[in-house]
Every structure is written in structure tokens, then in C-alpha cells.
Amino acid sequence: MNSLNDEPFAVVEQFSEVQIVQLHELVQQQWWGGKRTLEQVRIMAANSSLTIGLADAASGRLIGFCRALTDFIFRATIYDVMVDRAYQGQGLGGKLLDTLCNHPRMQEVGQIYLACEPRLFPFYERWGFKVYEARTEWMVKVQREEL
């Protein structure tokens, strides 16, 4: 774990089994994550291109997380930016985005995408994201109902 400027939080890129369980608990706090199982969360973390966590430096408890799927050159898509409810309002979502977007492996990526609720636009705009108006629209093929 790397300290964040002597703050009580540390960056995590490799997650212990205990932290994977804590990640599952964090996912369960989200409106979209209630049906996701521990095993599914474990698979998701293992197969993401880049995962960033924030942990309480004293206890090691995982309190924030985000991830990206990317080819590390043309495109990246950020998913699952989340901070434990007990730690929200301390700027940790921004620390997650800063750490992910400025990660050495992300420096050659041409465009970084994310999807969010419109109420979150002002938050993400502070990190340079904008509503993407293009000639194309995202399409989805549902192969199973989202958990």
C-alpha cells in the first residue's frame, strides 16, 4: 500500500482475500450491486485491466474502489467508482479518479469513458469528463440479467 501524502488512506492495487470480502460489502452498498455474489466480485476484480482501492492506512480496511477495462492505448472505460458510506464527503472519490486516470499504465490512453447518473455529471466534470455527444450511441446485448 502506498500512502496518500501522509493521509490516513493508502492506495491498493493488489487485494488480499479479506479486502475482496470488503469489496463485496462495498458493492452491496450500491443501488446496482445488491445481487452480486462474492465469487462474482472476485472474478470481476481479477479480470479488470486496472483496479484501484483505497484502504484505511491503520486497519487496511478497503473503503473505496474503482476499476478500468482498457487496451492501454486507445480507450479505457471506468466502472464502479465507490466509497464506503461512512467515508463519503472526504474527497476519496476524487482520489480514486486521480489515482486511476494518472496511473502510469493509463498515460497513453487516448480516451477514457464512464457512465453515470446525470446527477453525478458535476462531480465527474471536475476531472475533465464531459457528456459525450457523438455520431454513435452505445448499444447493449443482454446475455443475462445484470446482477
Q: Across the structure, where does each feature detected by a protein language model lie?
A:
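Conserved catalytic-core motifs of GNAT/GCN5-like acyltransferases
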Residues: 111-115, 125, 130-147
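A conserved beta-strand-loop-helix scaffold within acyl/acetyltransferase catalytic domains
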Residues: 40-58, 62-82
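Residue-level recognition of the GNAT/N-acetyltransferase active site
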Residues: 84, 117
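Conserved acetyl-CoA pyrophosphate-binding loop and the N-cap/start of the following alpha-helix
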Residues: 87, 91-96
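Conserved GNAT acetyl-CoA-binding A-motif
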Residues: 102-116
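Short amphipathic alpha-helix that is part of the acyltransferase structural core
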Residues: 1-38, 55, 135
